[in-house]
Amino acid sequence: MTPLVSRLSRLWAIMRKPRAAVGSGHRKQAASQEGRQKHAKNNSQAKPSACDGMIAECPGAPAGLARQPEEVVLQASVSSYHLFRDVAEVTAFRGSLLSWYDQEKRDLPWRRRAEDEMDLDRRAYAVWVSEVMLQQTQVATVINYYTGWMQKWPTLQDLASASLEEVNQLWAGLGYYSRGRRLQEGARKVVEELGGHMPRTAETLQQLLPGVGRYTAGAIASIAFGQATGVVDGNVARVLCRVRAIGADPSSTLVSQQLWGLAQQLVDPARPGDFNQAAMELGATVCTPQRPLCSQCPVESLCRARQRVEQEQLLASGSLSGSPDVEECAPNTGQCHLCLPPSEPWDQTLGVVNFPRKASRKPPREESSATCVLEQPGALGAQILLVQRPNSGLLAGLWEFPSVTWEPSEQLQRKALLQELQRWAGPLPATHLRHLGEVVHTFSHIKLTYQVYGLALEGQTPVTTVPPGARWLTQEEFHTAAVSTAMKKVFRVYQGQQPGTCMGSKRSQVSSPCSRKKPRMGQQVLDNFFRSHISTDAHSLNSAAQ
């Protein structure tokens, strides 16, 4: 018998041993978010339990670790197969992960600030900024934005005194623009209402600061203040799902609560900030969504997903008889709500990527718009007209080219667009309006197609005054203004159609060919910053990740 077969045979024998029966007590779900917040407030001073967030009836929690009732109690039972069996296993997981992190962690600017900054409020602020920027955004993209932000506003007081226009301008291109606005709102509240001091616990951070949810509050509290509280983001959820063979949708209420319970159980009370960052780092660089590097994983020996792969390999080779015990992880309670769903059974080709199985995402709704780059000569060069979006809704407060919703015919479209232009700039020659191409830009929930038009005012008296909410900018000013990535794409299409520039025909998705010759700044930063590190797939939120 080969060493591998011998090892897996012993593993198979261990995993076939009977497991503790699981109780199935039920409690009522919290009636509303307000009720859950009130519960959190009443318990904000309570010491976090090692099993906080786990279903109380579950008998599989490690002996010696206290249990705490759920905020939202779910009518489901959990098999001990999806838990850590004892304190020794939890301790082994912590030690292996932290040892790996100490050796392999990436040198990131927000980590350096958190380690070097002695003032607790400034440290918490630095962590807060990084966590908000990293939501749904890749690390390589965030590095330059974070560095520029902290140089411009190194303290809460600096950010609180900034204008929203300045915040939008620096945030331009980072996406999810409400994040920057909420961050400034929070800074102002800390300065004006909290005496300039950040709340010190995850509970009070979430209660008092606008836009700070459970994850962000936990990250700030653990990294900046050393509170032993777990966190779950997209990376951590993936790690936990694989380590405990949780195949159900992580976004479901049941699975989400279970993951938060596991995170709270595992967090190292001596190094909570490092532990949480280590779990996120593992998901971002090793336990990736596709092609995970299992051979480099520090907790591979504790990973049930990896054990399942080895079992299946033995069964396929004929070295073991019978059927896997995984689907019978809760034989006394019926179908397990955390295992792979019956509709999506084990796929041999996926390996550990079987865990978790996410629900199919609803495709973004499709919308169309017509937008026009209106240009006129100016003393410092050509000027283009921008108008400001409303202060609420998509891209709130940002600047864009005059736009209208798409009309069913070209004639109606030109008429509507010309009327919009004249509303801001006065009478214009309709014959000069040219259709240049299209740009498709996908937001989180909208796939928006822009039909791009151009109108150059040549030989006319320049427009010197415009209504409030509009302004003329030079091309240089445009590139530093608070405009969205979609508008920058639109402008590149316009530039590609002008004499003396890189000409191009009607196109979609991306802009002019000349803009594709150089890699994006984020990619350049990624290549240079992580050249000495292992290459990984881009990390996805909520994902995501980041």
UniProtKB/Swiss-Prot annotation:
GO terms for cellular component: mitochondrion; nucleoplasm; nucleus. Changing R179C: In FAP2; also found in multiple polyposis and colorectal cancer cases; loss of function in DNA repair. Belongs to the Nth/MutY family. Changing R244G: Reduced DNA glycosylase activity; decreased function in DNA repair. Keywords: 4Fe-4S, Disease variant, DNA damage, DNA repair, Glycosidase, Hydrolase, Iron, Iron-sulfur, Metal-binding, Mitochondrion, Nucleus, Tumor suppressor. Changing A224V: Decreased function in DNA repair. Binds 1 [4Fe-4S] cluster. The cluster does not appear to play a role in catalysis, but is probably involved in the proper positioning of the enzyme along the DNA strand. Changing P513L: Does not affect function in DNA repair. Changing L417M: In FAP2; uncertain significance; also found in a family with non-polyposis colorectal cancer-like syndrome; uncertain significance; does not affect function in DNA repair. Involved in oxidative DNA damage repair. Initiates repair of A*oxoG to C*G by removing the inappropriately paired adenine base from the DNA backbone. Possesses both adenine and 2-OH-A DNA glycosylase activities. SMART domains: ENDO3c (SM00478), FES (SM00525). Residues 364-495 form the Nudix hydrolase domain. The keyword Methyltransferase does not apply. Changing D121G: Does not affect DNA glycosylase activity. Does not affect function in DNA repair. Its main location: nucleus. Changing Q335H: Does not affect function in DNA repair. [4Fe-4S] cluster binds at C287, C294, C297, C303. PROSITE patterns: ENDONUCLEASE_III_1 (PS00764), ENDONUCLEASE_III_2 (PS01155), NUDIX (PS51462). The gene is MUTYH. Changing G500E: Decreased function in DNA repair. It is linked to Familial adenomatous polyposis 2: A condition characterized by the development of multiple colorectal adenomatous polyps, benign neoplasms derived from glandular epithelium. Some affected individuals may develop colorectal carcinoma. Gastric cancer: A malignant disease which starts in the stomach, can spread to the esophagus or the small intestine, and can extend through the stomach wall to nearby lymph nodes and organs. It also can metastasize to other parts of the body. The term gastric cancer or gastric carcinoma refers to adenocarcinoma of the stomach that accounts for most of all gastric malignant tumors. Two main histologic types are recognized, diffuse type and intestinal type carcinomas. Diffuse tumors are poorly differentiated infiltrating lesions, resulting in thickening of the stomach. InterPro entries: DNA_glycosylase, Endonuclease-III-like_CS2, Endonuclease3_FeS-loop_motif, Endouclease-III_FeS-bd_BS, HhH-GPD_domain, HhH_base_excis_C, HhH_motif, MIG/MutY. Changing D233N: Loss of DNA glycosylase activity. Changing I220V: In FAP2; uncertain significance; reduced DNA glycosylase activity; no effect on function in DNA repair. GO terms for biological process: base-excision repair; depurination; DNA repair; mismatch repair; negative regulation of necroptotic process. This is Adenine DNA glycosylase.
